[in-house]
Structure formats: structure tokens, C-alpha cells
């Protein structure tokens, strides 16, 4: 999302819109033509497109949304036209948002109503000891909570998705089911910031240091393949809050490098209802969709970073 925001900012900032359509029932009558984009900012996974009339267009990509940039004459290839939710077009570029979520137009002064609940943004330019300490305090506020759930909670730290959740747990040597109290919270926060900052400006999301397809991640989307450290088969299972099973996500782990703490099993706690069973998972390249981003294609350039798994 960070890279998406930077690309949109470079394409739109300071340029008047010749076309500004919002294809959402609540916003269908809004015409942004004539407005000028003053900035495109990101906070965690939220995109904030600020306009010169004192309003902000808020959007969220979730798992399936995307913004694409096109030049005049390009064919729009980001998806079926009925999935287009926003068109912000200048004389030089068109930013087209597909399958956008939480599309809202709010006074810029009220942005905090949309993002005020978020924890420290791991890619905040002002990141330092104060924000890190805030994140540690939020992470340890519920010491018995599973680490894998706490890391994905945007109220703790903003910016971690499923890919980084899996990789952070692996690099800490901690099971996703381990209580937060059993890990070094400061180390977890520092690792999260380091990984996201290292990958912020490139479409390939690598946690291993390798950029070759198939070699970029330690455990994410590698179910059944050999652990790069110990050779054990990478496992995967459902993990989510018991009260919100519809939001369960697949978590990846090495059962040898990340042993489940004594007294806990992957079939207990937050995995109830799924029995913690191993699930089939796509290949690493397919799940991260690295080839979708940052590439100029016939018909346009994807403005977004890899699929919102990070």
C-alpha cells in the first residue's frame, strides 16, 4: 500500500483533475473534475487522497482492491469495468481504482475519524523510539493473546499483513499460537519495522534477502515445502478470533523452528471451529503476486504494491 500511495502521489499531486468519478452509491453524485490533488498519503493500509477543497478521498485495498495508472490511449486492464470504483484523471495520467473498499469522501480535518484507531504506522517517516515504545505497549497490553493475532491487529501496529505476520513469527522463532508474553516484544516491533522499511520502495516483497521468484520468503505460502533452515515441511493452518471466524486467515509456520509452546495445541484457542487443520496453500509466487506490480504492461502500470498480503 505504501508503494501504491507513492506512485499515485507522483502521478497526481499538484495536477487538476479533468475527470473525477466515484462509483459508489453514497458518492455517485460527486464530481471531482476541476479539483486538484494536493497529496496522496498512506497510513498503514489506508490510502488518503487529499484535495484542494479541504476533502480527502479514503480507500482501502483489503485483499482484492487495486489502483492502476494509465496514460492517454492505454487500455484499462485492471479488471472488468463493473469493478471500477474510482477514476481520478489528469491531462497526463488516469488513476483507476478497482474493487476499492471503504470508499469515503470526508473533510481532511476529520481524517482521524477513519484512522485514529490505528496503532503506530510502521512506515511513518517519523518512526523512532517514541513510536516503537508505543507499539510495544500496545503489543503487550494483552499478554495472553496469540502472537499471530496481535501482529495482524492494526490497532497494535499499522501495516502488517499476512505475509509479514508469518515471516516475523518465523524469524523470531515463535509459534503464531505463542502468547505475546513469551516473546521479546521490542524485538518483534523492531523486526516488523525493519522488514517493512526494507521492502517499502520495491514491488518484490522479500524477507530472505533474495529477490528471485520462489526464494523471497521463509515460510509464507510454502506449505509442504522444506524449511530453508531445518528442512522440515512448512505447515499452514487457520488462525483467527473465535468471535469472528469469517475473518480467519491462513498462517504459515515451521513446526520445528517454531515449536508450539507446551500446553498449547494448534487445535485449541482461536483456531476452534477449524480444528487447526493444515490447509492447502498456493505457491509463493502465486500468493504474493509479485509479477503484478511495478511492471509497465500493454495498457498501463499497476500503481499498487503486491497483493495485499503483506
Question: Which residues does each PLM region occupy?
Answer:
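Gly/Gly-Pro- and Ser/Thr-rich, intrinsically disordered tail segments characteristic of DNA damage-repair
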Residues: 1-106, 226, 238, 295-298, ...
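Basic, nucleic-acid-binding surfaces and adjacent catalytic neighborhoods in DNA/RNA-processing proteins
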Residues: 16-31, 41, 75, 135-280, ...
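Phosphate/anion-contacting hairpin/loop surfaces
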Residues: 57-160, 164-173, 183
Amino acid at each position: 500500500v505504501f508503494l501504491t500511495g507513492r506512485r499515485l502521489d507522483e502521478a497526481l499531486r499538484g495536477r487538476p483533475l479533468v475527470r473525477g468519478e466515484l462509483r459508489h452509491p453514497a458518492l455517485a453524485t460527486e464530481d471531482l473534475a476541476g479539483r486538484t490533488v494536493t497529496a496522496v498519503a498512506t497510513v498503514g493500509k489506508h490510502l488518503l487522497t487529499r484535495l484542494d477543497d479541504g476533502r480527502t478521498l479514503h480507500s482501502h485495498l483489503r485483499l482484492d482492491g487495486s489502483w492502476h495508472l494509465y496514460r492517454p490511449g492505454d487500455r484499462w486492464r485492471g479488471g472488468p469495468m463493473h469493478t471500477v470504483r474510482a477514476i481520478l484523471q489528469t491531462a497526463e495520467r488516469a488513476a483507476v481504482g478497482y474493487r476499492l473498499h471503504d470508499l469515503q469522501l470526508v473533510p481532511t480535518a476529520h481524517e482521524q475519524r477513519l484512522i485514529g484507531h490505528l496503532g503506530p504506522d510502521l512506515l511513518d517517516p517519523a518512526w523512532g523510539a517514541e513510536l516503537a515504545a508505543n507499539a510495544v505497549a500496545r503489543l503487550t497490553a494483552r499478554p495472553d493473546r496469540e502472537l499471530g493475532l496481535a501482529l495482524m491487529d492494526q490497532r497494535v501496529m499499522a501495516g502488517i499483513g499476512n505475509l509479514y505476520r508469518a515471516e516475523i513469527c518465523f524469524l523470531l522463532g515463535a509459534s503464531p499460537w505463542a502468547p505475546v508474553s513469551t516473546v521479546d516484544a521490542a524485538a518483534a516491533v523492531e523486526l516488523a519495522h525493519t522488514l517493512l522499511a526494507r521492502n517499502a520502495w520495491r514491488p518484490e516483497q522479500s524477507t530472505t534477502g533474495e529477490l528471485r521468484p520462489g526464494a523471497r520468503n521463509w515460510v509464507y505460502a510454502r506449505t509442504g515445502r522444506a524449511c530453508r533452515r531445518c528442512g522440515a515441511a512448512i505447515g499452514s493452518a487457520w488462525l483467527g478470533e473465535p468471535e469472528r471466524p469469517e475473518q480467519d486467515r491462513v498462517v504459515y509456520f515451521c513446526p520445528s523452528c517454531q515449536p508450539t509452546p507446551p500446553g498449547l495445541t494448534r487445535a485449541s484457542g482461536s483456531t476452534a471451529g477449524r480444528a487447526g487443520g493444515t490447509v492447502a496453500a498456493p505457491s509463493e509466487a502465486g500468493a504474493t503476486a509479485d509479477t503484478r506490480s511495478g511492471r509497465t504492461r500493454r495498457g498501463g502500470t499497476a500503481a499498487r504494491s503486491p497483493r495485499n498480503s503483506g
